[in-house]
Amino acid sequence: VTACTSASSAGTVTVVDRPDTHAVNANYMGYRAPLRPLNFIKLPVGSIRPEGWVRKFLELQRDGLTGHLGEISAWLEKDDNAWLTTGGDHGWEEVPYWLKGYSSLAYILNDPEMIEETKYWIEGVFASCQPDGYFGPVNERNGKRELWAQMIMLWCLQSYYEYSQDRRVIDLMTNYFKWQMTVPDDRLLEDFWENSRGGDNIISIYWLYSHTGDAFLLELAEKIHRNTADWTQSTSLPNWHNVNIAQCFREPATYYMQTGDSAMLKASYNVHRLIRRTFGQVPGGMFGADENARLGYIDPRQGVETCGLVEQMASDEIMLRMTGDP
């Protein structure tokens, strides 16, 4: 990273290995103490207006499948949708996955029709709130509430808050996290996907804590961490699913932002190296995993899922924000 100094020393360039985090950014919100400071702060969605070829490519995305998926996808059918109707039978996972990108595209392009469509779904989320703090579809497996879809929707709500400053987001997240505090450990994050991906829940907890300073949130983050799959193993992984690995290797580093325990940070780097040491043969920097990484299938003919690629990109960006490491 290079940084130009003040006008009094114009022409001088200082090279640093990572940004200085001692000063507090007065313009944009980072992590609230005692969380470790972020090295890079994500700008609120919509604060940068694209021009030129970047805008053109975003418009192509709007005019293509992303912008029109609701017209053709059964999962986004509004009648009896799980995010719009109590007991709805479809869309519990697919809606927030799509909305996460669709809504950000709407805000960045400031597209009125897309913003209105986004608002329709967001209002459905608010309408789903229950008195105990839970929100969204009720999806139970073996009598235990499954929370993976909520983890995705929480990210949609954060983007909506950045765009709108709608206080209902803060209230919903606060009430939902209070509900999570009431769930016994033996009934929390027991399903495969949510158990692997608890780190996404922690990121949302830290986002809310940085806005409100509610102390119980740090206690909840510890609870989520201890009930999430163990991504700190030195020579193995909790599972070998490509999306889980790309998405979840950052969980220990995320928790490091609270504990300051360097072993947590090293664990994330270890997973990154471990999977690539054996399976890192896919052009472009990914590891080979046709759904799962499999011993014996380690050559460049192996593929990887598109969703594994995008989760790796997201993880790399989040890791950069947290660590400052290039």
Language model features with spans:
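Glycan-recognition and catalytic cores of secretory/periplasmic carbohydrate-active enzymes
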Residues: 10-326
